[in-house]
Amino acid sequence: MQFSVAAVLALATAVAALPPASGTGAGQQVGHSKNDFPLPKELTTKQAADKCGDQAQLTCCNKTVKTGDFTQVEEGLLAGLLSNLLGAGQGSQGLGLLDECTNIPVIPIISIASPQEKCKQPISCCQNTKSSADGDLVGIGLPCIALGSLL
């Protein structure tokens, strides 16, 4: 009985001596604070639209779907050989598709930081023509690319 009382008191003392947890409990990165494709603050909307080119529009997208971002453990002598040769092995970043996009008006003196604060996902360049994979043999349609990945 004496051992269990001593053990309980030691445990209570150790727990009381722990430092408090940091943060607010709401997550360490709030909102758009972690952007995979950050843009320079001095970049204007006109410069950003020029980077997109004349076949794409500057847009603000509110949905990103990332696939393929995982770690795979291979076993055996030749395990993972084919996937590593095709570039799908460890370290591959996956594919990011942007959806639910709206156009950003191009005003030469407006900084890109203003629309970027309102976007839930990275500012992107989207094709002017509708990208559809309906009826195609391969079926790939990638209409939007994050602007930060082009800089």
Curated annotation (Swiss-Prot):
It is found in: Secreted; Secreted, Cell wall. SMART domains: HYDRO. Residues 1-17 form the signal peptide. RolA enhances the polyethylene terephthalate (PET) hydrolysis in the presence of the recombinant polyethylene terephthalate hydrolase (PETase) and the PETase-hydrophobin interaction has a high potential to increase the rate of PET recycling. The keyword RNA-binding does not apply. Disulfide bonds join C52-C125, C60-C119, C61-C101, C126-C144. The keyword Flavoprotein does not apply. Interacts with cutinase cutL1 in a pH-dependent manner. Self-assembles to form functional amyloid fibrils called rodlets. Self-assembly into fibrillar rodlets occurs spontaneously at hydrophobic:hydrophilic interfaces and the rodlets further associate laterally to form amphipathic monolayers. rolA rodlet formation is regulated by the strength of ionic interactions between rolA molecules. Three types of self-assembled structures of rolA are observed: spherical, rod-like, and mesh-like. Belongs to the fungal hydrophobin family. Aerial growth, conidiation, and dispersal of filamentous fungi in the environment rely upon a capability of their secreting small amphipathic proteins called hydrophobins (HPBs) with low sequence identity. Class I can self-assemble into an outermost layer of rodlet bundles on aerial cell surfaces, conferring cellular hydrophobicity that supports fungal growth, development and dispersal; whereas Class II form highly ordered films at water-air interfaces through intermolecular interactions but contribute nothing to the rodlet structure. This is Class I hydrophobin A. It comes from Aspergillus oryzae (strain ATCC 42149 / RIB 40) (Yellow koji mold). The lineage of its organism: Eukaryota, Fungi, Dikarya, Ascomycota, Pezizomycotina.
